[in-house]
């Protein structure tokens, strides 16, 4: 078996166990603390994703690929099991939320290390694409499997089966420890201190020749307005149509994700500016949820649209960052910061969405978010047109002066 195939096989085992365990965890949270509790845990997860960018940069400058993967996989396994144990022991929700955030900082640091190993094993873009598609597909399978597990009187996985799920949640990282023995990635050179997310927040430049920082922030805003219902899909599907439809919801999202490359290719052919393309994708993410409560079929349609549009938005945004980078090091820093900004937007989305759903319903939320994204596109285009008109006016005046 080649190195790339071993890495993909490792990712399949880990991602299946992760998605199965996280889905069971999410259903437990929803039953114990409601959709608001699930929203807080998802927000903590996304904050962990965002914080993993600087952690990964620092660790990769101190550890080679083998050490980084082994340190993160052992730490993550302990945090996965510990977080589940805290929930089942009745720990305060705030403690569980902190544990979820910490677990995801470590998880996404390790995930960055795995992607670096994939690139080292096969630098072709198609290799990374296959890796990402394999992860997305197996995560959908894990979510669907969790939704179909036998449940106890409370409608939740319990007893010995629950113990097995929790144990597997941590043990599925064992292949990562083993594959780390053949790591190819050396310790990285330290990144310049001026780059990254901190530079964006201070108003500095993310990349020397990169896209405008406002463009990256705009992508985060689209995620804020468009991603909330999708990221709460496990809880929403269970509340709207029953636990069994969680499986179909996950599979519909995965099917939509497979269509995303076609959407991005069409956007590239039409050369649509982000001011139009990104809010349109956000409308696709949120708009279908306006009808998701009508029937299970409407739920599946909403998730199909969400998977297609969310994956396309992330792919298009990352492609714009990567093509503007002056060096591979710039690509890494740029992509990490773009992911962090998206994660912060999504964290805010899943924090406020449960309250709106509780008061007005998911249909109202989906419609309101889609309308807000349409208004955002109009405002963005109006700003572009006014700046363009001002530029033409200056050009005419200069010609006359000459």
Where are these regions (language model features)?
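A late C-terminal transmembrane helix in Major Facilitator Superfamily
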Residues: 328-360
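Helix-to-loop junctions at the C-terminal end of transmembrane segments
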Residues: 51-67, 150, 258-273, 357-358
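Hydrophobic core of transmembrane alpha-helices in multi-pass small-molecule transporters
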Residues: 12, 92-110, 220, 298-312
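C-terminal transmembrane helical hairpin of 12-TM major facilitator-type secondary transporters
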Residues: 273-314
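Intracellular juxtamembrane helix-capping segments at the cytosolic ends
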Residues: 25, 108-122, 233, 312-326
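Cytoplasmic helix-loop-helix junction between adjacent transmembrane helices
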Residues: 99-137
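Helix-loop boundary and gating motifs at the non-cytosolic
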Residues: 1-50, 202-253
């Amino acid at each position: 078996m080649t190195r790339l195939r071993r890495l993909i096989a490792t990712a399949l085992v880990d991602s299946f166990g992760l998605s199965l365990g996280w889905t069971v965890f999410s259903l437990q949270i929803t039953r114990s603390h409601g959709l608001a509790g699930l929203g807080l845990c998802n927000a903590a997860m996304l904050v962990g994703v965002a914080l993993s960018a600087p952690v990964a940069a620092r660790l990769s400058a101190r550890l080679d690929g083998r050490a980084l993967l082994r340190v993160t996989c052992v730490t993550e396994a302990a945090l996965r099991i510990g977080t589940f144990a805290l929930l089942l022991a009745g720990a305060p929700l705030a403690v569980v939320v902190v544990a979820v955030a910490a677990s995801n900082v470590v998880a996404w640091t390790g995930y960055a290390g795995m992607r670096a190993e994939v690139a080292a094993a096969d630098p072709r873009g198609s290799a990374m694409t296959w890796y990402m598609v394999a992860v997305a597909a197996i995560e959908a399978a894990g979510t669907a499997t969790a939704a179909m597990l036998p449940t106890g009187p409370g409608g939740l996985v319990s007893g010995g089966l629950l113990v097995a799920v929790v144990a597997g949640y941590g043990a599925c990282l064992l292949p990562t420890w083993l594959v780390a023995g053949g790591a190819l990635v050396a310790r990285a050179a330290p990144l310049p201190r001026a780059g990254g997310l901190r530079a964006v927040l201070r108003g500095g430049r993310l990349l020397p020749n990169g896209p405008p920082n406002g463009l990256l922030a705009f992508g985060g805003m689209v995620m804020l307005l468009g991603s909330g219902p999708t990221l709460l899909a496990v809880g929403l599907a269970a509340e709207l149509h029953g636990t069994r439809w969680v499986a179909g919801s996950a599979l519909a999202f995965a099917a939509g994700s497979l269509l995303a490359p076609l959407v991005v290719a069409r956007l590239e052919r039409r050369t649509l500016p982000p001011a139009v393309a990104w809010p349109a994708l956000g409308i696709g993410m949120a708009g279908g949820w306006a009808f998701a409560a009508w029937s299970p079929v409407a739920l599946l349609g909403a998730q199909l649209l969400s998977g297609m549009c969310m994956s396309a938005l992330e792919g298009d945004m990352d492609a714009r960052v990567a093509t503007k980078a002056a060096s591979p090091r710039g690509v890494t820093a740029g992509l990490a910061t773009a992911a962090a900004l998206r994660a912060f937007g999504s964290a805010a989305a899943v924090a406020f969405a449960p309250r709106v759903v509780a008061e007005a319903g998911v249909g109202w939320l989906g419609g309101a978010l889609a309308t807000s994204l349409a208004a955002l596109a109009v405002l963005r285009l109006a700003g572009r047109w006014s700046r363009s008109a001002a530029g033409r006016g200056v050009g005419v005046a200069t010609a006359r002066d000459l």
